[in-house]
Amino acid sequence: MLTSEAVVAASARLGPTSGPKQEEVCQPSGAVHESIIRAPLDYLLMLPGKNVRGKMITAFNEWLQLPAEKLEVIKRIVELLHTASLLLDDIQDSSKLRRGLPVAHSIFGISQTINSANYAYFLAQQELPKLGDRRAFEIFTEELLNLHRGQGMDLYWRDSLICPTEEEYLAMVSNKTGGLFRLAIKLMQMASETDKDYVPLVNLLGNIFQVRDDYLNLQSDAYSKNKGFGEDLTEGKFSFPIIHSIRANPANIQLSSILKQRTDDNDVKEFAIRYIESTGSFEYCRQRLAELAAEARELAKDMEGTATHAQGIERILGMLGIME
C-alpha cells in the first residue's frame, strides 16, 4: 500500500511538480542533462532500503580500521553498484514494486532505466582513483564479471525452466550476491594495514543473505508489502526453497508447472507455498541458515579468537536477521 507521504517524497526528490518551461525541456542545461540521465537512479536511491551492505562495511571496519575518507568512497561505490543492479534486476524480473513503490522502469521507461543503471556503473568506477591504488580497478572488474556471471546463470535456469542443484545454486549465489560483498571487503582489505583475509567469511555471509532472502520472499508479510506476494513464483525463479521442494519429489511437476506460468494469481501462489511447506522445504531453509551461521561463527573464531571479533560477527549476523 503506497502512502501519500512516500509518493510525495519520491516526487519531491525528482523535482518541482510545476515542471520546467517548454524551451528548457527542449534545450536542457548541463545540470538538467545530468538530472535527466540520473532520474531512475536517484529515484531508487531516495527510497529507504535496509542498507545491509553499508552496515556490513561499517561493521567490518571495526576490524579493518580504514581512514574515514576511504571508507566513504567504498560505501559510495557499493551503493551505486547495488542500486544499478536493482534497476536492471527489476526489468529482467518484470517486477512491479521495489521497496513498496513502483519500480523505476514503470515510471521512466525501460530504455532510460537501463541507461541510468549503466551510467551508475561508470559513476562507481570514477570513484576508484580516490582509493590511490591501481589494484582497485582489478578488484572492481573481477567482481563485476562475477556478478554478471551469476546473474546470467540465474536467468538461464529461469528462462529454460532448468532446476539447478543446491550446490549449483549456491555457486551462482557466490557470484551474484557475494560479488558486491567481496568487492567491498577486498577494497577495504586493500586500503587497510591488516593482513587478515575476510573473503571466506564474506562468502558465507553472502550465502546466508540470499537463502534468507529467498525464504522471506515466500514467508514474510513485510516482504510481500515491499515486493509483492510470492514474487519469486511470479518471476518463475528457482530460489533455494523452491529448488529443495522440486528435488524432494521430482515426479510431481506441479511446482515447476506453476513457475512456468509466471502466475499473478494469489490463489495459485498460495497453493504453491502450501506445497513447498509440505515438502519440508521451509524447515530445510531454517536448518541450512542455522548451519551456515554456525560456520560463519566458527570461521570468525578461528580467524581471530577474541571476544571483540565474536561480538562483531554476531552483530553482522544480527543485521542479516540471524540470531543465536
UniProtKB/Swiss-Prot annotation:
Entry's cofactor comment: Binds 3 Mg(2+) ions per subunit.
For the ligand (Mg(2+) 1), the binding residues are 89, 93
Residues reported in the UniProt entry to bind isopentenyl diphosphate: 50, 53, 82, 99
Q: Which InterPro entries match?
A: Isoprenoid_synthase_dom_sf, Polyprenyl_synt, Polyprenyl_synt_CS
Keyword Transferase among record annotations:
yes
Q: Name one GO molecular function term.
A: metal ion binding
Enumerate the Gene Ontology biological process terms: alcohol biosynthetic process; mycotoxin biosynthetic process; terpenoid biosynthetic process
Q: Which PANTHER family match?
A: GERANYLGERANYL PYROPHOSPHATE SYNTHASE (PTHR12001), PYROPHOSPHATE SYNTHETASE ATMG, PUTATIVE (AFU_ORTHOLOGUE AFUA_8G02400)-RELATED (PTHR12001:SF70)
Q: What the protein does? A: Geranylgeranyl pyrophosphate synthase; part of the gene cluster that mediates the biosynthesis of diterpenoid pyrones. The first step of the pathway is the synthesis of the alpha-pyrone moiety by the polyketide synthase dpmpA via condensation of one acetyl-CoA starter unit with 3 malonyl-CoA units and 2 methylations. The alpha-pyrone is then combined with geranylgeranyl pyrophosphate (GGPP) formed by the GGPP synthase dpmpD through the action of the prenyltransferase dpmpC to yield a linear alpha-pyrone diterpenoid.
* The name this protein goes by in its record: Geranylgeranyl pyrophosphate synthase dpmpD
The source organism is: Macrophomina phaseolina (strain MS6) (Charcoal rot fungus)
Q: Which gene encodes it?
A: dpmpD
